[in-house]
Amino acid sequence: MAFGENLMTQFKIVLENQALDQVERDLRFHTLGVAQPQTLTPEQIAAFNRDGFLKPIRLFSEDEIAVHRRFFDGLLAEVTAAGGDSYSISTAHLKYGDVYDLLTHPRIVALVKDLLGENVIGWGSHFFCKMPHDGKRVSWHQDASYWPMTPSKTVTVWLAIDDADVENACMRFIPGSHHYGHLTWQLSEDDERNVLNQTVPDAERFGAPVDDVLKAGEVSIHSDLTLHGSEANESDRRRCGLTLRYCTADVRAYQGWNAKGVVVSGADAAGHWANAPRPV
């Protein structure tokens, strides 16, 4: 089955607003962290709850991330040949074993368990690949605003496939913005050239942005309510990152999105999430 017949049509990256309005959502920040963390320090957990993000954390060596980069290079060639673009590779863990292996990777899962607890669902995998001079930006937004899920207890692990810095349009966070809950947004204007479709206007009134500079193989972790975005990549270098999404097992997904979820730690006692096997 071709990529375009599966992932690009099964789940929309951006749902219609009407579909989201049908879901009653609890979009408040819930303090995260376990009493006895095994990988993160208590200070890191406190910083996450205060700022809404952690960065940078080294997870993979240069040789290890080079293997993942070669896989992505091949995947990108396949997707573009099928008519997709560098932002359209989403929910790939349900089709590609290599992405599933990253979603369930012990080093990554250990990080999120220290924030979310023992019972964890991995439900998202989306490559955000900014090609050189592609002109597209990601406007200021909150992830939870896009998702038919409740309550808002998802964290995103952003894995740098390439180096990400100011020159090639790394992500930016507004510290503490997650404490304001679900913020008012507007549909993006065409001249924004937004990869997505929501914009929180005048976002910097909530604080001064912080650049998420990462070397390939490093990750950052952010809350689903943390304001973030990125500018257009005007450099000669590509900037690719893989977003991996995790939530507590008590989160409920609607519009069929529970089909995305894989139990990466503990159990899903209610059996809400599909827990698809590793693709081969």
PLM regions with names:
Residues S86-Y96, R107-F173, H178:
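Conserved double-stranded beta-helix
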Residues D63, M131, D165, Y180, ...:
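Feature marks short, surface-exposed loop/turn motifs that line or immediately flank catalytic pockets
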Residues P37, F53, T156-A160, P209-D211, ...:
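Conserved hydrophobic/aromatic beta-strand scaffold that supports enzyme active sites
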Residues M149-P151, A203-E204, E234-R238:
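A generic structural micro-feature
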Residues A2-I121, K215:
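N-terminal auxiliary "cap/dimerization" subdomain that precedes the catalytic jelly-roll/cupin core
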Residues V166-L227, E231, V251, A270:
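Double-stranded beta-helix
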Residues A2-G33, L76-E78, V219-I221, L225-V280:
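Non-heme Fe(II)/2-oxoglutarate
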Residues R58, G176, Y246:
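Active-site donor-binding loop signature of nucleotide-sugar glycosyltransferases
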